[in-house]
Amino acid sequence: MKPFRIGIDERTLGPLGLSPFETLDWAIMNEAEGVQFSGGAGPAPDRSFLRELAQYAEENRLYLEWGGGEYVPFDPATGRPRDIAAVNRAAAEQAHTLGVDTVCAAAAGPKRWEKGPGTADERLRLSARSLRELGPMLRDLGVTLALETQSAFTTFDLLRLFEMCDVRPGEYLGICLDTMNALTTLEDPAEAAGRVLPWVVTTHINDGATLLAEDGFVTFAAEAGTGVVDLETIIGKLGTLDHGINLSLEDHAGGVSVPAFAPGFPAAFPDLA
């Protein structure tokens, strides 16, 4: 197995309210090997700030990964369609300035089982159309948009999305593998990782578990080794990749309510039937 560099996702330190430079200092003091800023660095950081951040990371031998992208073209508050081109261009240009070749993109739209706008399959097609339009820009900047595995789509869906975009591993789209989010889409995390393995370019490494609830169950993050995610198998799979992968540890509070007992809920997951 190839050696990994192990760092953190900046959201892990959210309660501390650290600036990007303070986050790098935390990584240095705690012997982390890098930081993924999966949410970017706030509103429109200028180029001089980004260059100084990249230089500081390099001086301290830290890997740096970037985020702030989105891949579901719907407003999470209203559910209405919206253009995601500008936010992805900004994130990709920031990554390019930093000398980083990936941008983590979140799925801010409805969860797969939620109604409207449209069906999950229709939302997938609209997402693919939006991402196809980003291809030339991402190629020009040499940046891969890493779609985080979240509750908007299953890994089966994401493979269909890549097919709709006529893209292959190593091109302008990839995966940010969140090891526990598969629990929210009723997938086995290790099997989900295997499905999208060639596409994985960045990671959110975390353990998790589920608890029964009145309407189904709740998924939540757990201390590594205490949950149900087979991290040993997943990391073993990542170690077979030809390209280098960093392991960015992510921890966060809260859980996701999955209404598995609701009428018609299983129909939202045809690949798992």
Show which residues each predicted segment covers.
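A short, structure-level motif marking secondary-structure boundaries and short turns
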Residues: G7-E10, F37-G39, D75-A77, G118-A120, ...
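Acidic-and-aromatic substrate-binding clefts and catalytic sites of carbohydrate-active enzymes
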Residues: L13-L18, F37-F49, V72-I84, K111-K115, ...
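Hydrophobic faces of well-ordered beta-strands that scaffold small-molecule active sites
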Residues: F4-R11, V35-F37, L64-G69, V103-A105, ...
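N-terminal pre-domain/capping segments
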Residues: M1-V100, P270-A273
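Conserved, mostly hydrophobic/aromatic
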Residues: I8, A27, V35, A57, ...
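Histidine-acidic metal/acid-base catalytic patches
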Residues: M1-R5, P20-I28, T155-G174, L183-A273
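A short, hydrophobic secondary-structure junction motif
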Residues: I28-S38, A92-A95, S127, L131, ...
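Active-site acidic/histidine proton-transfer and metal-coordination neighborhood
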Residues: E58-E59, Y63, A77-G174
